[in-house]
A protein has these predicted regions:
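Conserved N-terminal beta1-alpha1 strand-loop-helix module at the mouth
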Residues: 1-224
Length: 224
């Protein structure tokens, strides 16, 4: 549920996350990314104040999906952010329970739910999060997302096969060198990257961004 701007069909969907400035946003857009992620989690190295950044985010081309990443924020703040005119969708990247997600779906706010993957059991008994878009990400020493570490991809293909109604986005330690292999193995609808295309935390490397987008779409050309 990334909103009407995203159609999960055809080529591999690519989201570049941890965007902190307009220049990096345009680099990702020109490289062919489908979505940009803005981290609103206060302790993150890539945190931005969404209101301070609203002018340059709003100036990004309308065809680009703008995703606000939140984690365990309170209900009022999540709804307020999700209804901002320059935010197209939310990404819940904390331990938000299914009931919270159900309320968000009932409110008509587009969102994706990220879940940590550490083994087969972490995917075997996932509850209903009331969204058609889920992000499988790695967890390292209690830190979830933006770790630069992969999780064992062998656990993901079965989940993708058994959840055809879910748009699965693969994240966690992806970079231009491994994303092609990951897409071949897992067959996700999309991929999400932060650390793997950075020159430093919060600053993107244009060459890495371009290489990542190209490599992500190389294996099949399209996703069935």
């Amino acid at each position: 549920m990334f909103g009407g701007k995203v159609k999960f069909s055809g080529r591999v969907f690519v989201k570049i996350c941890g965007i902190t400035n307009e220049t990096d946003g345009r680099i990702a857009m020109e490289a062919g990314a489908d979505a940009l992620g803005f981290n609103l989690v206060p302790h993150s190295k890539r945190y931005i104040d969404i209101h301070a950044a609203k002018d340059w985010i709003a100036k990004l081309p309308e065809e680009m999906c703008r995703v606000a990443v939140v984690a365990d924020a309170n209900w009022e703040d999540v709804c307020r952010i999700g209804r901002l005119p320059f935010v197209d969708a939310l990404q819940l990247h904390g331990s938000e329970p299914p009931e919270f997600c159900r309320r968000l779906a009932d409110a008509g706010i587009p969102f994706a739910k990220a879940v940590p993957v550490s083994g087969s059991k972490s995917l075997a008994s996932l509850p209903n999060y009331f969204t058609d878009t889920m992000i499988l990400d790695s967890s390292e020493n209690g830190e979830f997302g933006g770790t630069g570490k992969t999780f064992p991809w062998k656990f993901a293909p079965e989940f993708v096969r058994h959840h055809r109604g879910i748009n699965v986005i693969l994240a966690g330690g992806l970079d231009p060198r491994n994303v092609s292999e990951a897409v071949k193995l897992v067959r996700p609808r999309g991929v999400d990257v932060t650390t793997g295309v950075e020159a430093s935390p919060g600053r993107k490397d244009a060459n890495l961004v371009r290489a990542f987008v190209e490599a992500a779409r190389q294996p099949f050309g399209s996703v069935q």
